[in-house]
Regions:
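Charged, often glycine-enriched C-terminal and inter-domain segments
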Residues: 3-23, 66, 81, 85-89, ...
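Cys/His-rich short segments
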Residues: 27-102
């Protein structure tokens, strides 16, 4: 006989839990062997009787032309037995619904959408048939800072113009807590800084681990103080005489284009 039905449950975890591994308690309603009849389907004091149609085999042979086809017995529905006096609790099914709590282990590095299979924790089968499996679908909580990119962690870091030009040591969040990231002098907006080994472990190999990929964005203030404005105007005057290579190339092309 085939196994009991498989069940599916959804679990939502944080990115931090996905990186380190965790355990979760799942509450579900599943079919289990009836407590009144111990799964036999027969009322107390009675027993199922052997099906006369299939002689207890649960299958019958039917001739179709030159061939014989084996199929489930129509009298006992493939069980090989007939319940003449069914259990009142389960109406002869041998199963009843029960609320259960099942604790599962979620491995480090588990990916969103991955299905974890818990053997034998689905619906139990009637009359000794093995239970099906529990399929647990993993989902991620929305994170305030991070997003997963393969085994890497994507993170956007806003910095000031002066920090990008002069460089800075900045405290940033990681999956394992706070860490210091060195922003090199002359960092460009959109540049990716890599924090090695600060990503997710591979769910297939704990020895392999991704990185944290920090995309630097230069924040341009909408308002500045009088002192800041004066300093910026002085800087603008200097920039008119000291043009960088990329900007100089653009200005040369601009002049050439417009003659």
């Amino acid at each position: 006989a085939r196994r009991g039905e498989s069940l599916r449950a959804h679990v939502i975890i944080s990115l931090e839990a996905a990186a380190s591994g965790t355990s979760k308690t799942i509450r579900l309603r599943r079919k289990v062997h009836c407590g009144s009849c111990s799964g036999s389907g027969a009322a107390a004091g009675s027993r199922p009787v052997t099906c006369n149609t299939c002689s207890g085999r649960g299958q019958v042979l039917r001739s179709q032309g030159f061939f014989s086809v084996r199929s489930a017995c129509p009298t006992c529905q493939g069980q090989g037995e007939i319940i003449e006096n069914p259990c009142k609790t389960c109406q002869g099914a041998g199963l009843e619904q029960k609320n259960e709590e099942i604790e599962i282990e979620i491995p480090a590095g588990v990916e969103e959408g991955m299905i974890l299979r818990v053997t034998g924790r689905g619906n139990e089968g009637a009359r000794g048939v093995p239970a099906g499996d529990l399929q647990v679908v993993i989902g991620y909580e929305r994170h305030a800072f991070f997003q997963r990119v393969d085994d890497h962690v994507g993170f956007e870091l806003p910095v000031s113009y002066s920090q990008a030009v002069l460089g800075a040591d900045l405290e940033v969040p990681t999956l394992e807590g706070k860490a210091v990231l060195t922003v090199p002098p002359g960092t460009q907006s959109g540049e990716i800084l890599r924090m090695r080994g600060m990503g997710f472990p591979s769910v297939h190999s704990r020895r392999s681990k991704g990185d944290q990929l920090v995309e630097v964005t230069i924040e341009v203030p909408k308002k500045v103080s009088d002192e800041q404005e004066e300093l910026l105007r002085q800087l603008a005057e200097i920039e008119e005489t000291e043009v960088g290579a990329r900007r100089k190339g653009f200005l040369d092309r601009f002049k050439e284009y417009f003659g």
